[in-house]
């Protein structure tokens, strides 16, 4: 086969003396690409990718490269590429002159005077504006700050601010330890907010709130009220005004265990001698006993009522189905447990006589 026409060599249009006289025509040696220019081309291509590779190795247009980040990093890369395109083939390739250019037709520098281009006339202003925008973006980035001061042992609500404000301040959030009896161990160095007025206002609101859950909720209300009183005392607000429901009920903890951790600060009475009226004033013991007598009688009557109801419910059971003895015994046990409910009389099975007229194809044996 004849391979003479397989390769067609195109001579340099500028002639053999164009490379030798390029510096003289350009006026200075700046027309030739330097090592810095090659390095910038390498970085702009992403470490050897992009325009430095053949078209078959480049990713498809719809697919993002693995190393390319989105957001602000992607914007910087696109602007850098725009600057690189502005200087595309504006300098002559020294490696092509030496015969060692690895980029061949994908090189960003001119491989001859016919490929040489001129940059835009205002290229210096464009480059300066790009550098200023890059510096301003770096200044507005939030630095990662580490705190060298002590930390509050595992508590996210309080943190030490050591190192002269080296830690990030969270003055918009309230300190959790500041509202406890012990107080915040960091004091003014704490990075969270210490609000004296809100502390006093919160303690008064807790003490004036009504009790929750009736008699069973005395313990929890007692704890909240005592904590509010101690917090108010720690804040230096002086003696707090007693609420209208002060010691109007017996303390559950004191009545069950004989001990209350709050002592004299408890909002509930420790015995009949400490009982107060609603709004203030001690309760008269004689009138309290007289008022308690009807309650005891009512309790005796209410205790007798379930027993009578249970007896009435058990009398209905013998009229139930006598053919199911096991079910009858079980029903009697359930009826004994449900003493407070009214037992329905259990109706006896009517047999097929009552349902023989439901279906049209039923054969009535009586006919």
UniProtKB/Swiss-Prot annotation:
Keywords: DNA-binding, Metal-binding, Repeat, Zinc, Zinc-finger. Residues 38-80 are annotated as: Disordered. SUPFAM superfamilies: CCCH zinc finger. GO terms for molecular function: DNA binding; mRNA binding; zinc ion binding. PROSITE patterns: ZF_C3H1. PANTHER family: CCCH ZINC FINGER/TIS11-RELATED. This is Zinc finger CCCH domain-containing protein 56. It comes from Oryza sativa subsp. japonica (Rice).
